[in-house]
């Protein structure tokens, strides 16, 4: 009754055409990334190398990186690819393999290009809120990124109490400001979902709350645990006047009102959830 259609994998030329069509990246910016991806996939197919346990490099990830390079051609491609493959969490030997593959295709970290090609690492001063925008400047005062703040007064007046407020307890440094700059790029400009990974107590929630406070974005929060279920993600039960009632979960409210959804301890719940 039903015809069987076999979809063959894309050729290299077809995949490159899709990436450029979806991102608008130039050939100059894509060439070194494309060379690394081809080399990475070839090495990852060899079980003796050790990359088979690392993160795969799919077309969707390639499009995401290409969109970022199309918007910011001078971005640190080395750090972008290194972070995309979660190399900081890989064994040292596998991390070194990725590092040498990047060097082989001419992708080096900013600050190590050599004479006449030196690009200093981006060092940012504390972000500034001015005229309804959030602005990032480098240490010389040159503007790096400027995004409009969220107009919650007209779009979500009920979410005013959900905007984080650190009450001046957040202190900026170059590393944290650089991380917030990258989060704002992905969250506000490229409209990407984010996964923050790191050791316990490194301030992931603190940094995320500070970003949302600077952007004036209301946020919903939910914390996962090993007993979390799909039903808890959709609605919550509570007792009122002796009656059991159900209300929308923070996830549903975030979707309905267009708020940022922060899911904490996501690694604690089961894979099915």
Task: Indicate where each model-derived feature is located.
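Conserved AAA+ P-loop NTPase core
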Residues: 162-166, 172-173, 221-252
């Amino acid at each position: 009754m039903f015809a069987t259609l076999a979809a063959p994998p894309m050729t290299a030329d077809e995949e490159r055409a899709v990436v450029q069509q979806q991102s608008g990246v130039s050939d100059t910016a894509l060439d070194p990334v494309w060379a690394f991806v081809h080399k990475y996939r070839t090495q990852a197919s060899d079980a003796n190398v050790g990359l088979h346990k690392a993160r795969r490099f799919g077309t969707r990830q390639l499009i995401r990186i290409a969109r970022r390079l199309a918007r910011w051609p001078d971005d640190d491609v080395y750090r972008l690819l290194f972070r995309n493959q979660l190399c900081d969490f890989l064994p040292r030997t596998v991390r070194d393999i990725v590092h040498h593959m990047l060097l082989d295709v001419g992708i080096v970290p900013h600050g190590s290009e050599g004479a006449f090609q030196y690009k200093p690492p981006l060092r940012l001063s504390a972000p500034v809120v001015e005229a309804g925008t959030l602005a990032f400047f480098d240490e010389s005062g040159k503007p790096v990124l400027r995004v409009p703040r969220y107009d919650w007064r007209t779009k979500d007046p009920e979410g005013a109490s959900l905007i984080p407020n650190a009450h001046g307890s957040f202190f900026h440094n170059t590393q944290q400001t650089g991380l917030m700059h990258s989060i704002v790029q992905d969250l506000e400009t490229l409209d990407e979902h984010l996964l923050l990974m790191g050791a316990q107590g490194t301030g992931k929630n603190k940094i995320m709350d500070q970003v949302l406070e600077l952007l004036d974005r209301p946020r919903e929060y939910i914390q996962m645990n090993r007993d979390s279920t799909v039903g808890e993600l959709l609605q919550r039960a509570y007792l009122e006047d002796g009656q059991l009632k159900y209300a929308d979960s923070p996830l549903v409210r975030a979707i309905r009102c267009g708020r940022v959804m922060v899911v904490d301890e996501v690694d604690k719940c089961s894979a099915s959830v």
